[in-house]
Amino acid sequence: MKNVKLLLAGMAITMAACSPQKQAEEPTLKDVFKDKFLIGTAMNTWQVAGLDTAAQNVVKKHFSAIVAENCMKAEEIHPEKDRYNFAAADSLVAFGEANGITVTGHTLIWHSQCPRWFWFDENGELVSPEVLKEHMREHIHTVVGRYKGRI
């Protein structure tokens, strides 16, 4: 009985001393599909700024493309007729470039998340089709011009 206990103790020590083999790391989503298509996700300003580091790390590891969740929508990037706010959009593009992630464009103007001035004049009346087309042209040219070749 004493020999069995010694044998078991020796086996336990031997097994404890053996380190487990390093398991093979699972391939990332972007690596699995790299020869077929980009794997993308939307990013919000908190993630881009590094305030949600867990999400940012998942994006860096698994995704080959990003798109702005909201920071490039007209309401955010062009809040007033003569004022643009590119800070958050610039950060998103810089994050993609710094991490080798393709930045994908999104709808520049749509029915939702567009500033009120885009559709209505200072009297609260709908702008004319001509004025609306000019707002659209100016907005599109400004945003596309700023990020040309980067998105």
Annotate each PLM feature:
Residues I13, M43-N44, N99:
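Short alpha-helical scaffold segments that flank and stabilize functional sites
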Residues A24-P27, Y84, V127:
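Short coil/turn linker and secondary-structure boundary residues
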Residues A65-P79, A88-I151:
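Substrate-binding cleft and catalytic face of glycoside hydrolase catalytic domains
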